[in-house]
Amino acid sequence: MKKVRAIANIIIVAILVGLTVVAIPFTSSVRASVNPNVIYQGDTNNNKVSFMINVYWGTEYLEDMLDVFDLYQIKTTFFVGGSWVAKNVEMAQEIYKRGHEIGNHGYNHKDHDKITEQQNYDEIHKTHLLISANLGIEMNLFAPPSGAYNDTTVNVATGLGYRTIMWTHDTIDWRDKNTDLIIKRATKNLSNGDLILMHPTKHTLEALSAILAYAENNGFQPTTVSEVIGE
């Protein structure tokens, strides 16, 4: 891990100079929300950004990802699914012990815009209780699985004390197994207050050091979602 920073800088130069043609277009989900409880981007008046991690699978990559964040002395936000936590309590505790923020990602990775008000409540509240019991913390950030939500979802989340977190840029790393492409999507047009969506995958792990190095080398401060949105 000691050579990671130097290698990351080399990777950045090679990718950002050489990767001029991308088969799949860069995807950004920036859009204004009329609901103040749905957040797509944080405070654009400061240099903070968040490379947030959504977790339902990919447990085998998390330890190494945590090591990379430690190397750069960066804390971020992990939105964890309740069903994942139930099977991986020790790893969830390890993420929290390392100083990272924990967010609610529902319980069963359902499309929250397709379920009832009661089901929305159950998904969010059950996860809240599970994490509180095992980590001893309270949470106030909810990331709907697949970014699927409607007014009912937001109202339920708000009633439970949550703000609904979306993203500014989506790396689509769960689908596209391409390290260079993940780096490009995470860093292209990076701006103050951006929220970048990532997952624990093999190629995301390979890309992570280069992404963090790029952010720091370009004057950004990677941190937790709460820090970016000013909570």
Regions found by a protein language model. Name each.
Residues S29-D111, I115, Q119, E123, ...:
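Active-site beta->alpha N-cap acidic-glycine motif
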